[in-house]
Amino acid sequence: MSAPGESGASGGSLPRNAVPVDGPAAGEQYNPGAATTPRQAASVILLRGGARELELLLVKRTPKARFMGGVWVFPGGAVDAGEGDGDEAHRAAAVRELCEEAAIALEGPQSLVKFSRWITPAQVKIRFDTHFFLARLPDRQEPAVDGGEVVELDWFTPQSALEAHRDGRIALVFPTIKHLEQLSGFSSVEELLDYARERDVQPVEPKVLLEGEVARVLLPGDPGY
């Protein structure tokens, strides 16, 4: 998921020769036993653009990270103790993480529009229940890297991010790819925000299918899910 985490010391690694577009992230740990409880997390899809434009911010995690090192993600992270419960906690974490990772200060939780909710597959050791929010870039603000967890950032259209991934210029993981594929269907920030405000968000929990040395991620409705 787009939330940060550390690989556990125990548990076998998921096969590393999975197809990049639909495989688990390198370093994720396969959990052969009972599913672990997902940690609550939040992520922000920061948007900019005019009436006929839509760009979004991706940040690159430091290659030194043991989990998803060097991967480009939407800014985000785990909910901290003291940030409340439920939607309030997810919104507070989203605002905080965007400020910490990209130096963008939103006016407050009301600046966020709920877009999606993804839960890490039960077959993976480290799990997150991540709530994704949309937010417009505030006036007179520009993102900046924190120099720690985040080492690079850039603006992409959804299509250009997917092309950069296919060309091997940036590394993306499954949830980010699937979000970009959906976002590519919108031509402007306003169109996307209008859609999201009316959307009934339902949780998406993929499954990992192990086929010998190859792992694939399946979504609800896929054959074999």
What are these regions (language model features)?
Residues 1-150, 154-225:
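N-terminal leader/linker segments that precede catalytic domains of diphosphate-processing enzymes
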